[in-house]
Amino acid sequence: MNKEEIFQQIRGKLIVSCQANEEENPFNPPEEMTRMAQAAAIGGCAGFRANRPENVQMIKEAFPDKVMIGIWKVETEGCDVYITPTMKEVEVLREIGSDIIAVDGTDRLNCNGRKAYELIREIKEKYPDQVVMADIATINDARLCVQAGADIISTTLSGYTADSLDRYALGADFELIE
């Protein structure tokens, strides 16, 4: 699918996040996560957001006509950036068929000592047609990600970063959403 086809398919429609913590979760195995995706597909979703290559690949193979937002959460000691933090994860997510790759789009430092949003520019330089979703926490993050070439902005990290905790305590950050 090209960018316009992806946007046309998801515009105004529901994307279902099919994710489970790795530990002690009955939906953790990829087969179970695919069943969760099946329920969402029956309900009419336009696509899925899934974590880890094995889940992304199995769900995409089961539902090739649905849009797949692939992420890979990698936790590194001493580093707050964990959503698809480096090109290594991007390469794998591309290879297994992610239509959209979501990355941390904050201005926090990744495990390589670079601002997380800088990965967007690197992806776009190597793969200009790759649709990139930036998971942001603040309006400033959104601006930086748009300048870096992000195709989609998601408020995924609002309330989860030092820059956004105070706003989250007040409830939904409608200013950020707008």
Q: Which ranges hold each PLM region?
A:
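N-terminal amphipathic alpha-helix/helix-capping segment at the start of soluble metabolic enzymes
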Residues: 1-27
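Short beta-strand/loop segments at the ligand-binding rim of alpha/beta enzyme cores
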Residues: 11-16, 63-78, 124-137
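Glycine-rich phosphate-binding active-site loops on the catalytic face of alpha/beta enzymes
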Residues: 19-21, 42-43, 48, 72-76, ...
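Active-site-adjacent beta->alpha loops and helix N-cap segments on the catalytic face
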Residues: 27-30, 49-69, 80-87, 105-123, ...
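Short catalytic helix/loop segments, enriched in acidic residues and glycine
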Residues: 31-38
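Short, surface-exposed connector motifs at secondary-structure boundaries
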Residues: 38-44, 123-129
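Conserved, mostly hydrophobic/aromatic
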Residues: 40, 59, 93, 145, ...
